[in-house]
Amino acid sequence: MAKERIRIVVCGDKGVGKSSLIACLVKDQFIPNLQDALPAVTIPRDFSASPYSPQNTILVDTKNSDLAGLQKELKNADVIWLVYADHDSYERIALYWMMMFRSLGLNLPVILCRNKSDDGIEYCRSNLTAGGEGDCGTIVEDEEFIPILKAFKEVETCIKCSAKNKLNVNQAFYLCQRAITHPLAPLFDARIGELKPLAIQALKRIFVLSDKDQDDYLSSEEIAALQKKCFGKTMDVNELNFIYKTLVDLSASNQQYADCSLFVQNKGITKMGFLVLNKMYAENGRHETTWGILRSFHYTDSLSISDKVLYPKVDITDTSSVELSPLGYRFLVDVFLAFDKDNDGGLNEDELNVLFKCTPGLPKLWSETCFPYSTVVNNRGFITLQGWLAHWSMTTFIDYKTTTEYLVYLGFEKDAKLALHVTRARRKRRRNGIFYRAPVNDRKVFNCYILGKPNSGKSSLLESFLGRPFSETYSPTIRPKIAVNSLELKGGKQYYLILQEFGQQEPAILENQQKVMECDVLCLAYDSSDPESFSYLVNLVNRYQHLKALPMVFVALKADLDKQQQRCNVQPDDFTEQLLLEHPLHISCMWPSSLNELFIKLTDVALEPAKNTPELVPEPIQEDTTVYWQATVVAGSLLGLASIFTFTLSRLINSWRNVPN
């Protein structure tokens, strides 16, 4: 990535012209009879015409007589400008200088420069063209450079210069900068002439994201869009045709690509063609182009996406929750539709595999929750759009960092935190000495824990929530289960409800008060046909007193079976009355209407927690005094009018009596 400052250390045998190169670069002229070593020179960004220059570049001259000082400077360097000038100094490149760098444990790019090449302009990266600033390179078969390049992977580029004739001095300096701003080593293995695996992986991902219609080709329009995104400018038709022709010619002339298509007429560039094109850029010294593509997709020098992009800082209080914003939902809808190639309304396994090729794979959280069976699937087991959005809503609620990470991998181009909505902190109120949660009006995702004795019907409840048929087969829950779905309340408002069952981990979960407080509503379920079932809930509530801080809904499951008297010191209706709660809802997986009533009830309670908070005395109903006061005002007005009428009438009568006959 672009650095604010680059430190270039110039080293080599005495007399090879290190100081002359620096002086020529700075003064733009050859200066003879310089001192043994120049002081460090700071070169600002505007010195170079290159758009990739850092804010400052420091050039450090060295002298061999001060070995300790030389080694200190090398350890502080970003890049090494290694200079030789004749056969003897060339021999010491491999025998002395490269060995010294390795003994110091340096892992820095080395730009090898043959100075005093006063007879011509030559510049080599292996035996291939490496166009530098101004694209001045020529193809060079150089018996000096090639052995060094093959023997030492640290040597990134070789160039012939002349300080006396001012030849390639600026280019050599530019190559030193480019070795840091646009390093070749992460992209290309010069020894085997191939792109490195991480580069291939990154470029394949970029191809998939740029292939908007998912037809496995980059069309002219898609290439133009990629060009605009990466470089901020459009691509000329002639440039595009030149790329196409290059790929076609390469397919015809190179046996390596005989069995694969690089470009198909009227369709576009294939994935292999895209990789080959970037390989050619690396071979020809134009890897700035590849880096321009990579960095527009947020890749760092290590070919990983920056953590600052994957995990943006989001300010969240302890009692806030995180949900998807409308922008996040819109993006995920677009992703679903783009990868649903057969337009059947569901993502099958192959479509999901293609979708997640752009990412590190299926999110760990999804694997742990048995995706896709933790949400809505169609009759063929393919996740639907409803299930897709529900699962992402759950993921964001539980671990929003997974959501931002995968949104970036899937091609979300804006700041990932714009895809999130942070709810207001949960507020508490107090009534008669009991704290309870205030009503919620800015949330759409709620978390419900289902607690109850094994074999009470909790798993069947989760399956019914996802619209699946009831199964008579009992399978004990060992690991936690989770289900998420959307539901619509009166008024057309849509919410997402997460149901969690903990199985054998239930005691450990309930011991963890912080984990318990993440819940919005408790669903306490028992088997109404099992006389031993309800006592489990009584013991649970009495043992874990902190559960009473949460709103509760008691549920009598298997209501289609014969109801049994519970073998407990308190019956369900009496126990709920003691807690000042409503009597248990009678639910059966065989009665769809009762299930819908339960899920709506759970969501309503999450929105209005006070209604179902244990031991919370209902707020006194205040009589509506409006009618009373209206009646009082009317009566007062009538009384006033009557008084005025009586007074006026009496005055009239008196005046009549006083009139003489």
Curated annotation (Swiss-Prot):
Cytoplasmic side: 1-626
Compartment(s) of residence: Mitochondrion outer membrane
Residues the record lists as binding Ca(2+) 2: D340, D342, D344, E351
Protein topology in the membrane: Single-pass type IV membrane protein
Entries under SUPFAM superfamilies matching the protein: EF-hand, P-loop containing nucleoside triphosphate hydrolases
GO cellular component, one term: mitochondrial outer membrane
A biological process term (GO) from this entry: phospholipid homeostasis
Chain ranges of the EF-hand domain: 198-233, 327-362
Record flagged with keyword Transcription regulation: no
GO molecular function: calcium ion binding; GTP binding; GTPase activity
Residues annotated as transmembrane: 627-647
Family membership: Belongs to the mitochondrial Rho GTPase family.
Protein name: Mitochondrial Rho GTPase 1
UniProt organism field: Eremothecium gossypii (strain ATCC 10895 / CBS 109.51 / FGSC 9923 / NRRL Y-1056) (Yeast)
